[in-house]
Design a protein with these regions (language model features):
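The feature marks the mature, well-folded catalytic cores of soluble enzymes
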Residues: 1-136
């Protein structure tokens, strides 16, 4: 899980993500504080139920309001393959972090046998945002 330090309505994705809205009378700082509190509470609940939760801190140098949703840029598969997906929004692309994959493999002992990188499709304006996409 990625701890959100810049959480807010993402102006780059709000046009096609109808779950986002501007919250009147709530400061950006209050939104981040509430998101962090909810995140930390969820981590505590999951751990109290025996779930092994790995938390990565968001990169404070980047503007990544959706960083707590890594399931859109990466997927992990039982056979050790990792998928990296092409993202529509520029600030979502910045969420992809090699340090996370490195730590998962070398610190947390995840088996990574192959990284399947589809991100080249961004240059062709073709996007498939991991679990954010559904094929019917």
């Amino acid at each position: 899980m990625v701890r959100p330090t810049a959480f807010r309505m993402n102006e780059e994705t709000a046009g096609n993500n109808y779950y986002q809205k501007v919250l009147d009378n709530v400061s950006p700082e209050d939104i981040v504080d509430q998101a962090l509190e909810e995140f930390d509470n969820m981590v505590d609940i999951l751990r109290s139920e025996g779930v092994n939760v790995i938390v990565f801190e968001d990169d404070p140098e980047t503007d990544t309001p959706d960083s707590l949703f890594p399931n859109n840029w990466v997927s992990f598969h039982a056979d050790g393959r990792v998928g990296l997906y092409p993202m529509l929004a520029e600030n979502r692309r910045v969420e992809r972090r090699e340090d996370i994959l490195f730590d998962l493999e070398h610190v947390h002992r995840f088996k990574i046998s192959e990284v399947v990188d589809f991100t080249e499709f961004e240059t062709h304006s073709v996007f498939l945002e991991g679990t954010g996409s559904i094929v019917l």
